[in-house]
From Swiss-Prot:
Belongs to the MIT1/WOR1 family. The lineage of its organism: Eukaryota, Fungi, Dikarya, Ascomycota, Pezizomycotina. Transmembrane segments: none annotated. The keyword Transit peptide does not apply. This is Global transcription regulator FGP1. It comes from Gibberella zeae (strain ATCC MYA-4620 / CBS 123657 / FGSC 9075 / NRRL 31084 / PH-1). Keywords: Nucleus, Transcription, Transcription regulation, Virulence. Signal peptide: none annotated.
Length: 342
């Protein structure tokens, strides 16, 4: 075990809780492998790099604390994750890990307001009971808060510094941990592929325990991240209410969407492209692509399942969020929806 070759569990970018849950589920089912040990000193230069994701469970690995030899800043909260950013120098022994004070802005110079929506609303949350350091204020690099949280200019960071992002879950009473590494440039350039953007994970559906049996800081339905909660950027509710975490995940990442391709290095899917589960009889794969879906003209809510969506026009894929919202919003047969708007 100690001399075994260590490889990453996955190579890509874990953007949100839904991405992480897909990775955890794939590890639990054996599609991906858990990390059996921490990297040795001689392995760190090749393993602790942008894009590598490691998942380990405390029971069999015996890992109580993940170490990688990088000089990290104090942690910051980012939704259900903790993020760290690589620094030029470590803190001296006994030195307090205080964020540096930013210079005051000169009066009379107004900074243009950035109207772009931030990818997360939780990048500057205060300390949590576990002792996570409070976030800093804005400053240079505010446009990257979706990637670094509040770690924008509060410490002496390396140029294009490595970022560590972690999240933990419990399965059958055993903690499982995910540790991912990336740089802002690699994410922005699209070099790192999210699990939800890879066809391999189109058939990976997290089990109920992973969705609703966790003590997440931000529950999925309360805004753990935008995609997992099934709410579009302009705030429209697009699914029946009420619903649970599992329904939210199915709606946001369910099998209705055709799988997409991307970089994946550990076991590509077998037998070609996977068809969605529970596909209507008229749905077929032609030449490796999905044919338009024929669905009933009048959507209906039955046994808590999701509303069917109208067939696509002009041969394009249907817009799951937009069409469901329009059907429900315009159809008086759904009083529960209109009651939510009052």
């Amino acid at each position: 075990m100690a001399n075994s070759v260590l490889t990453a569990t996955y190579e890509g970018y874990i953007r949100d809780t839904a991405d992480a849950l897909r990775i955890f589920e794939a590890c639990l089912t054996g599609s991906l492998t858990h990390t059996a040990r921490r990297p040795h000193d001689r392995e760190r230069s090749t393993l602790i790099t942008s894009g590598n994701v490691f998942v380990y469970e405390e029971g069999s690995s015996g890992i109580k604390r993940w170490t990688d030899g990088v000089n990290w800043s104090p942690s910051r909260i980012l939704g259900n994750f903790l993020v760290y950013r690589e620094m030029n120098q470590p803190f001296s022994p006994g030195e307090k890990k205080r964020a540096s004070k930013k210079p005051k802005k000169q009066a009379g110079v107004a900074k243009a307001y950035d109207h772009r929506p931030q990818a997360t609303r939780f990048s500057s949350m205060p300390n949590d009971p576990a002792g996570v350091c409070a976030g800093g204020d804005g400053g240079a690099g505010d446009e990257d808060r979706d990637l670094v949280g509040s770690l924008t200019d509060s410490y002496d960071f390396k140029p294009n510094s490595l970022i560590k992002k972690t999240i933990s879950i419990t399965h059958n009473g055993i903690p499982h941990h995910l540790v991912s590494y990336y740089t802002v440039d690699d994410v922005r350039s699209g070099r790192l592929v999210r699990p939800s953007d890879h066809e391999f994970f189109g058939r990976v559906q997290p089990r109920m325990e992973l969705m609703s049996g966790q003590n997440f800081r931000v529950p999925l339905e309360d805004g753990g991240d935008e995609e997992s909660r099934g709410v579009m950027s302009h705030g429209q509710q697009v699914m029946p209410y009420p619903c649970n975490d599992y329904q939210i995940f199915q709606h946001a990442y369910g099998n209705a969407a055709a799988p997409r391709t991307g970089q994946f290095t550990y076991g590509p899917p077998q037998n070609g492209t996977y068809a969605p589960v529970s596909v209507p009889a008229t749905h077929a794969i032609q030449n490796g692509t999905y044919a338009p879906v024929s669905v009933p003209a009048t959507p209906a809510l039955q046994n808590g399942t999701y509303l069917p969506v109208p067939a696509p026009q002009n041969g394009s894929y249907y817009n799951l969020h937009q069409n469901v919202h329009q059907n429900v919003h315009q159809n008086p047969a759904y009083p529960w929806y209109h009651a939510q708007l009052q």
